[in-house]
């Protein structure tokens, strides 16, 4: 059974992950593309370096906003980690937030 505390913790984790402009840009890109993308594609599309993209993707993955899978690219002869959005909805209202403190 999921408790109110667990619900609050999951909500806080998602809000924290979405609370950075670059992570919002990553989510927006994945939503627009509507397909799994690998790290280089994401970094190139957003004009950021791979290391920075990876840090933010890890945070989004830990929050359950994106998921990743490793796929062998036979053409390149290496494994690539692809990222895609996990469907999610965030509903916030004063009534919902009131329940948090009760």
Model-derived regions: residue spans:
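Short, Lys/Arg-enriched N-terminal segment that forms or immediately precedes the first helix
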Residues: 1-16
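N-terminal helix-turn-helix DNA-binding core of bacterial DNA-binding proteins
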Residues: 14-49, 72-74, 79-83
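Alpha-helical residues within the helix-turn-helix
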Residues: 44, 61-62
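Short, hydrophobic-biased segments on the C-terminal half of alpha helices
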Residues: 57-58
